[in-house]
From Swiss-Prot:
Protein's UniProt name: Peroxisome biogenesis protein 19-1
Name of the gene this protein is made from: PEX19-1
GO biological process: peroxisome organization; protein transport
Protein localization: Cytoplasm; Peroxisome membrane
Subunit description: Dimer. Interacts with PEX10 (via C-terminus). Interacts with APEM9.
Statement: the UniProt record of this protein carries the keyword Coiled coil: yes
Coiled-coil regions listed in the entry: 17-49
Species per Swiss-Prot/TrEMBL record: Arabidopsis thaliana (Mouse-ear cress)
Amino acid sequence: MANSHTDDLDELLDSALDDFKDLNLSHQRNQREAQEEEEKKRKEETVLLPSGVQGLGMGLPDMRSKKRGKQKVSKEDHVAEALDKLREQTRETVKGLESISSKQLPASDDDGMVEDFLKQFEDLAGSKDLESIVETMMQQLLSKDILHEPMKELGARYPKWLKENEASLSKEDYKRYSQQYKLIEELNAVYENEPNNSSKIMEIMQKMQECGQPPSDIVKEIDPGFDFASLGQISPEMLESSPNCCIM
């Protein structure tokens, strides 16, 4: 009788243990599924920017679409770290643009211009949402003072290159490069006639995303060491937590 009672108790304990294991596994599975669903949702809501070298304008945040509401910039350490990285990479971008421009800025203006950019950026960080900060920074980097001369240098080489290479290019590539040239000309016209029309400038740069990189021959002729995809990769996520900070 005692043995029977002990066996029943053992079976009850084993059953309870099995139920506990099932409950624990089910809880872990549900927790994992919830985390995966949250990650999937976050990725769908976030505007991901291309990380590789894709083309003129590639990496510009799409200001025509609304992101996840208005986000306030955190005042934690990673913001300061991101700003430090942004300062250095912005300086490199400006210097790269100067290297391909026939009308170079005085050397003394270089660091001062970059510091002005970042000072404005830091001032905004404590008071505005991320989308506004990104837009302000892009307006600075895409301004006439920074981008007009390099775009003139670039556009001036297209007519000859298109004529010399039309026979060897596919119809698709020729059409793409021709559209690229058209957009560069449009951008230069805005710089000459409406230099403060930042929304138009940004709209044209957005369209350039679809045209890829400029012809490698032209890039090598202007400055083989400069990456045209460095003209503006900025994302709100970079200021929030990303360890990799990049400008276009």
